[in-house]
Curated annotation (Swiss-Prot):
GO biological process: one example: riboflavin biosynthetic process
Active site annotation, chain numbering: R84 (proton donor)
Signal peptide: none
GO molecular function annotations of the record: 6,7-dimethyl-8-ribityllumazine synthase activity
Residues that coordinate or bind (2S)-2-hydroxy-3-oxobutyl phosphate: H123
Protein name: 6,7-dimethyl-8-ribityllumazine synthase
Keywords of this entry: Riboflavin biosynthesis, Transferase
Gene Ontology CC entries for this record: cytosol; riboflavin synthase complex
Top EC class for this record: transferase
Record's function text: Catalyzes the formation of 6,7-dimethyl-8-ribityllumazine by condensation of 5-amino-6-(D-ribitylamino)uracil with 3,4-dihydroxy-2-butanone 4-phosphate. This is the penultimate step in the biosynthesis of riboflavin.
Source species of the chain: Rhodococcus erythropolis
PANTHER family in the cross-refs: 6,7-DIMETHYL-8-RIBITYLLUMAZINE SYNTHASE (PTHR21058:SF0), 6,7-DIMETHYL-8-RIBITYLLUMAZINE SYNTHASE DMRL SYNTHASE LUMAZINE SYNTHASE (PTHR21058)
Family: Belongs to the DMRL synthase family.
EC number(s) from the headed UniProt entry: 2.5.1.78
Length: 155
């Protein structure tokens, strides 16, 4: 992609602040990778929400502005011992899929739901590293999908 194809295109990155120390790492991985792919750093607008459950509504509102060519969502949904996490994770992923299908703006998920997570150093370190990787993967997926969609016939 040449720089003239990138100019003026925006990407929204929505991040839950629950477990911020870990979820911030997805933002870091995404930002580093998107810049490596040739996008100017200021192409990405960052938005924060309290938790993952709030992400789909924000994604929908941002998609409807027409300003964004892609939206990325990042969050960590953990099992707090009351089986709620499965319902939250499903609602978030289903909501994100609906946003992209309803608005025609691609939405990428770095909302992760580990089988086991505890607030101890080993898990925090593991998931922090994993979120960097997933953020970078999301950047590459954004780039590939945006290019692919632009190549499709419009009528």
């Amino acid at each position: 992609m040449v720089m003239s194809e990138i100019q003026g295109q925006r990407i929204a990155f929505i991040q839950a602040t629950w477990h911020r120390n870990i979820v911030d790492r997805a933002r870091d991985g995404f930002t580093d990778a998107i810049v490596e792919l040739g996008y100017p750093k200021d192409t990405v607008d960052f938005f924060e929400v309290p938790g993952a459950f709030e992400i789909p509504l924000h994604a929908r509102r941002l998609a409807k502005t027409g300003r964004y060519q892609a939206i990325v969502a990042a969050g960590l949904v953990v099992d707090g011992g009351i089986y709620r996490h499965d319902f939250v994770a499903t609602a978030v992923i289903d909501g994100l899929m609906r946003v992209q299908l309803d608005t025609d703006v691609p939405v990428f998920s770095v909302v992760l739901t580990p089988h086991h997570f505890h607030e101890h150093a080993e898990h925090v370190d593991y998931f922090s590293t994993h979120f960097v990787k997933k953020g970078a993967e999301a950047a590459r997926a954004v780039d590939a999908t945006v290019k692919s969609l632009k190549a499709l016939p419009t009528s």
